[in-house]
C-alpha cells in the first residue's frame, strides 16, 4: 500500500490541497497523513544555506522526522530539502501546489529518481 502525506502549512491553499487530495487518495484506497507545520520563518528554515531551497514555511527537521515511510509527498510552502529527501527512502513523487518550487530541492530529487510536479 502506498502512503501519501499532505503537508498542512497553515495556509488556505494547503488546507484546500489537503481536502481535495485526501478525498482522492482515500477513493484510491491509499493511506493519507497530515503533518501540521510551524508556519513561522526563522533563520534555520527561511534561508537557503546551500540546502537547494529558499522561500518556504516550516521546519525541515519536523518534516524529516515524519517521511521515512512516505511514497508521495504533497506540499504548498513546506520545505522539501535534501535532508527531507534523504530521510524518505520510499519517496517517488513530490507535488507542489505552487507555480514554481523554490521550496523543493529539485536537483536532489532528480538524483534520487523522484519526480517533481508543480
Residue spans for each PLM region:
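N-terminal glycine-/charge-rich "phosphate-binding" loop or analogous flexible N-terminal tail
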Residues: 1-70
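Phosphate/diphosphate ligand-binding glycine-rich loop within oxidoreductases
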Residues: 8, 71-118
Amino acid at each position: 500500500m502506498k502512503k501519501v502525506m499532505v503537508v498542512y502549512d497553515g495556509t488556505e491553499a494547503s488546507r484546500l490541497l489537503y481536502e481535495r487530495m485526501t478525498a482522492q487518495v482515500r477513493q484510491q484506497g491509499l493511506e493519507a497523513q497530515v503533518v501540521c507545520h510551524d508556519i513561522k520563518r526563522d533563520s534555520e528554515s527561511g534561508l537557503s544555506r546551500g540546502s537547494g531551497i529558499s522561500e518556504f514555511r516550516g521546519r525541515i527537521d519536523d518534516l524529516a522526522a515524519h517521511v521515512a515511510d512516505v511514497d508521495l509527498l504533497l506540499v504548498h510552502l513546506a520545505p522539501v530539502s535534501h535532508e527531507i529527501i534523504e530521510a524518505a527512502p520510499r519517496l517517488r513523487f513530490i507535488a507542489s501546489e505552487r507555480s514554481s518550487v523554490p521550496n523543493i530541492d529539485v536537483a536532489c530529487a532528480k538524483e534520487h529518481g523522484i519526480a517533481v510536479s508543480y
